[in-house]
């Protein structure tokens, strides 16, 4: 009974005490920069990151300096060839060149030519014994082939020689001794019938005709051959006889 009669008094004391504490905190907040009132608590864990916001607009160029020049790019394909430009003006006359080197080379070349000429003379001497026959300043050679007169002329011309043409008894004998068979001579009357001429030009000055020759038998015998006995006979130029060429010795 006593407990129930004292209950109102106890409630009043609790309320009064709580009010006094709240009042004290409010007064303290007015005079202190930081005062913790009530029961102290700890901070919670950080929350999750929020979603990315929308993309912003492009900003203005910054005030930074221009960077250094980059490396050159790859070479492009070659272009088309342009048109030829106009002819330039004539240049000034140059100074005279140094000919001392040229003169030395020329002297050396002349020396080599002399050596070659000496060797060529030696070869000609060998040919005299192995391929031909020499008579004074002429060398007669043959390849041993039989052919028409036109081909004999061509062959000798290619060798820078002429068809063998004896102009005296000594040369006639030299050709006779060298030729193993009947041979053409460089004498014809193709231009004027009956008037025999040298193929190199000029009228014939020496002859050694066989008896009753030339007779132009059957007409068309415009060429001359040297028989094995050394006598001459006129014959058709289309016939084939030994080719003998004449070189200056």
Curated annotation (Swiss-Prot):
The helical collagen-like domains from three protein chains assemble into a coiled coil and mediate trimerization. Residues 41-102 are annotated as: Disordered. This is Mannose-binding protein A. CDD domains: CLECT_collectin_like. GO terms for cellular component: collagen trimer; extracellular space; multivesicular body. Residues 48-60 have a biased composition (Basic and acidic residues). PANTHER family: MANNOSE-BINDING PROTEIN A (PTHR24024:SF35), PULMONARY SURFACTANT-ASSOCIATED PROTEIN A (PTHR24024). GO terms for molecular function: calcium ion binding; calcium-dependent carbohydrate binding; D-mannose binding; oligosaccharide binding. It is found in: Secreted. Disulfide bonds join 156-245, 223-237. The modification 4-hydroxyproline is found at residues 54, 61, 72, 78, 89. It comes from Sus scrofa (Pig).
